[in-house]
């Protein structure tokens, strides 16, 4: 029965792929062959390949019964699609194989995922059953379901997105949950095997009324600290912060097995753009801590649906720590995308300076002299619908998009650093922009939807001059 469901899903995906439109389909970001994609799942290095699984609906460009899509890569940049790994339909995952993680259990690729069942009609979140399940594979492609390995505590329905790792000769698992008082929390379990688990403690929880669910947890050490990474739902916007439908971020602290997680800071968003959710981390083959997120947002219009697909992932980002601050940089493998190079000489800009007439897939590096630039606004623009600019009056870096025909507009912004220069590394794809600020001190990621004739890339300044100290551009392929 499982194989017939996988076969039906693969056939449906193939039919959808035949009619997929490519106006917004990315050149160098992982996206589904067709259909729907959301959370990254099961990121792992296994059998000399990187594996990225993801939440996938192969029958439609809309969210639906969740399958696990699958892609592999040699370098985390160039991805090859593989057969669908998991399809829902068993008693414990009848309505969805929800998010989870992957581990190498003595040469067996093991997927730990949430089995989801609607108890009172699809979409009624007040009546669900969620359990943690296991599926295994020796070749990394074909998986056998092993059934339920963990059920929720009494009184908890929302219980999902297991992240598993091994430490101190013990398996550990964090699971996102909503407690009976409608407050988000992360539960910690320990296991002698992937099939036998014991509750350890509530690792962290929201304050009353702060958020009603904590999804997609991850827990890892980096530098001198541990980081709890998760996606809270129900946070209220505060000024420039928490403006998206849902957030994703980290809480730093200290932890060792058997002890409390001693938090040393507050929740901080990982990405300050419009579109970033459900990040998951893993270790590269050389031990680097890498994170990939879903570069979309719930309840966003997603114009690519008209062309038979929706959703894509961010570039793989290397995490590091400096002076207690978490940094995110594109993995160095991203440089393999570079093709034609174009230098951008230092200059003073007072109007518009065109870099590319038709920028499809580019990387741009810019270093602005903040102290010597007096323009009210200055920065980079793509067509008339996307601007990344310094606002001298508010002293903020602003990522603005304006696609009224797609019902998409608005901006996200962060404070300018208290220094003389601002260094930006920007990746523009067919329908996305990712901005790495000051060597990874901050990141802003957003989906953009310019029409083919709206891809002129230029620098600009208004009401004054802007001083560019350094610039470079590469066409990517």
Label each region the model flagged.
Residues 215-217, 279:
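Repeated scaffold domains used in trafficking and secretory/extracellular systems
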